C-alpha cells in the first residue's frame, strides 16, 4: 500500500497543482446539466436509428431537436445512442428477473448501471443533484458520457445471463420475453406517433422488430440445442456484427469519408496545409518560430496542428492554464466563425496581444472580417485563397525571442479586465508586475538553438 501510494502520489499532486491553475478546476452545475441525456433517448436501446441518427442532420428528430421544444441541451446527436445490440437486449429481457438470485458481483454491476443511468439523465432526475456533489463528479462536463459505461456494463450483464442460460442455471420462457420486447417496441412507436414522425421511424422500428425476433429465435435455439461452443460463438458473433452493421450503421460521428480528413495525414496534400508548411519553413531567422491559427474551418481542423507540428494558439477542447483562458477568451473549439471569440486583452487579430504572441499565419474558412469585426482593410495580408478558405499573414508578428532593454511596471489584472495596454515599444520593453526604474540596457540579441517539447535552448547576448 505504501509503495503504491508513493508511486501514484507524486503525479496526483502534480495533477492537483495543475488543476488549480487550469481553466477547468471544476465545472458548475448550470453548465453540466446542459449535457444531460434526455429520457426519450433511452428508447434507442431498442430501436437504434429511431430518431434518424444515421441519416442527414436535417432529418434528425430526437432530443435535443426542435421536435422536443426548448431543452437547453447541447449534445451531438450520437451522444443519445444507448444501443447495445438486439441479442443483448433479448438476453436481458429473458434473464433480468432472475438476477435476484445472481451472484453478489453481478448485483454490484446492476446497481452500478442504475447509478450511471441516474447520473446520465442529469437534470431529469433529482438524483443528479446528490451525485454531482460526490467528490470528483464536478470534474466531468457531460453526464451523457455515462452512456459509454452503461452500454458496456449492460452488455457484460447480458453476457453473464447468456452464460447462466447455456449452463442450465437459469430458465426462461419465450412468451414473457417476447412480451417485454414488444412492449418496448410499442413505446418507440408511440413516441414516433406523438412527434408525428411515423413515416421516418417506421423502417427503423420494423428493422428492430426483425432483429429482436431473430435474436429471440437464435437464443431459443442455442439454449435448446446446445451446439458446439465454437459454433455458438460464431453464431453470436456473426449475428451481432450483422445487427450493428445494418441496425446501427455508420453515422457522421463514427464513419465519415476518409477524404474529409486529408489534412490530418502526416503526408497530406491539402493545399492549405502545404502552404502553411512552406510559409513556416521559409522563415529561417534564428529568433523566429511563427505561430498560426485555424479558425472557422470546421470541427476537425484544430487537430491538424498536432499532426504537422504547427504552433497553434487554439485547439480542440484543450486543457489550458486559466491565465491563458482569461487572456484569449478562447473557446473549446473554433470550428465556426462565432466560436472564435476574443477578449478585452486580445480584442482582434490586429492587436498588441496578437503581435506579442507571434501569431503570423491565420487560416480561416470565411473572410477574416466575418470572424473579427474589428479588422480594417490592410490589417491582415491575404496570402492565398484555397479550396478550404483563406490564408492571412499578420506582418507585425513579433519574433519568438528577443532582448528587451527596459522594463515597465504594469497592472496585469487591469489589462485583462479593460484591454488597456501601456503605450510603449514592445520590441524594447517588457511589462512586469514589480518592475524597477532602471536605465535602459544596451541592445542585445537572442536566438533559438533548439526547440523540443520538454526543453527549449536559447542563446542570448545581453550586454
Stretches found by the model and what they are:
Residues 28-31, 229-320, 392:
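Extracytoplasmic
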Residues 3-96, 132, 137-148, 193-205, ...:
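Periplasmic/ER-lumenal interhelical loops and adjacent helix-loop junctions
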Residues 59-112, 165-172, 219-232, 373-375:
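Long hydrophobic segments that form regular secondary structure
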Residues 256-271, 311-356:
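Luminal/periplasmic acceptor-recognition loop/helix of membrane-associated glycosyltransferases
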Residues 74-77, 90-99, 259, 267-281, ...:
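Short alpha-helical segments and helix-capping/turn motifs at coil-helix boundaries
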Residues 1-2, 102-107, 111-117, 121-269, ...:
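Contiguous transmembrane helix-bundle modules in multi-pass membrane proteins
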Residues 206-207, 310, 315-317, 334-335, ...:
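Flexible, solvent-exposed extracytoplasmic
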Amino acid at each position: 500500500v505504501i509503495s503504491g501510494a508513493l508511486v501514484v502520489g507524486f503525479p496526483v499532486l502534480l495533477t492537483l497543482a495543475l488543476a488549480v491553475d487550469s481553466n477547468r478546476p471544476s465545472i458548475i452545475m448550470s453548465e453540466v446539466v446542459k449535457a444531460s441525456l434526455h429520457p426519450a433517448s433511452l428508447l434507442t436501446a431498442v430501436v437504434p436509428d429511431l430518431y434518424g441518427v444515421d441519416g442527414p442532420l436535417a432529418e434528425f428528430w430526437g432530443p435535443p431537436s426542435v421536435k422536443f421544444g426548448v431543452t437547453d441541451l447541447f449534445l451531438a446527436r450520437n451522444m443519445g445512442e444507448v444501443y447495445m445490440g438486439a441479442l443483448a437486449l433479448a438476453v436481458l429481457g429473458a434473464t433480468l428477473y432472475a438476477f435476484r438470485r445472481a451472484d453478489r458481483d453481478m448485483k454490484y454491476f446492476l446497481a452500478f448501471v442504475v447509478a450511471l443511468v441516474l447520473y446520465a439523465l442529469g437534470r431529469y432526475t433529482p438524483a443528479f443533484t446528490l451525485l454531482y456533489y460526490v467528490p470528483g463528479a464536478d470534474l466531468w462536463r457531460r453526464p451523457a458520457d455515462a452512456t459509454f459505461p452503461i452500454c458496456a456494463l449492460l452488455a457484460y450483464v447480458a453476457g453473464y445471463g447468456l452464460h447462466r442460460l447455456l449452463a442450465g442455471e437459469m430458465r426462461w420462457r419465450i412468451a414473457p420475453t417476447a412480451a417485454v420486447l414488444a412492449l418496448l417496441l410499442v413505446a418507440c412507436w408511440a413516441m414516433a406517433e406523438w412527434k408525428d414522425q411515423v413515416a421516418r421511424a417506421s423502417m427503423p422500428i420494423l428493422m428492430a422488430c426483425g432483429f429482436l425476433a431473430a435474436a429471440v429465435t437464435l437464443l431459443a435455439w442455442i439454449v435448446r440445442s446446445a451446439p458446439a461452443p465454437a459454433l455458438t460463438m460464431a453464431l453470436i458473433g456473426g449475428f451481432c456484427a450483422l445487427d450493428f452493421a445494418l441496425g446501427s450503421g455508420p453515422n457522421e460521428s463514427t464513419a465519415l469519408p476518409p477524404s474529409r480528413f486529408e489534412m490530418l495525414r502526416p503526408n497530406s496534400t491539402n493545399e492549405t496545409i502545404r502552404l502553411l508548411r512552406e510559409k513556416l519553413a521559409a522563415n529561417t531567422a534564428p529568433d523566429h518560430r511563427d505561430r498560426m491559427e485555424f479558425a472557422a474551418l470546421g470541427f476537425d481542423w484544430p487537430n491538424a496542428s498536432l499532426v504537422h507540428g504547427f504552433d497553434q494558439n487554439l485547439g480542440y477542447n484543450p486543457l489550458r492554464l486559466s491565465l491563458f483562458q482569461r487572456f484569449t477568451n478562447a473557446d473549446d473549439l473554433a470550428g465556426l466563425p462565432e466560436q472564435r471569440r476574443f477578449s478585452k486583452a486580445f480584442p482582434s487579430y490586429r492587436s498588441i496581444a496578437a503581435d506579442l504572441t507571434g501569431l503570423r499565419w491565420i487560416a480561416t474558412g470565411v473572410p477574416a472580417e466575418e470572424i473579427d469585426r474589428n479588422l480594417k482593410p490592410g490589417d491582415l495580408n491575404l496570402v492565398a485563397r484555397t479550396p478550404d478558405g483563406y490564408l492571412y499573414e499578420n506582418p507585425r508578428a513579433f519574433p519568438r525571442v528577443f532582448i528587451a532593454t527596459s522594463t515597465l511596471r504594469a497592472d496585469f489584472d487591469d489589462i485583462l479586465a479593460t484591454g488597456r495596454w501601456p503605450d510603449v515599444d514592445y520590441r524594447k520593453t517588457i511589462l512586469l508586475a514589480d518592475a524597477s526604474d532602471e536605465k535602459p540596457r544596451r541592445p542585445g540579441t537572442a536566438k533559438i538553438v533548439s526547440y523540443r517539447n520538454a526543453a527549449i535552448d536559447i542563446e542570448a547576448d545581453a550586454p
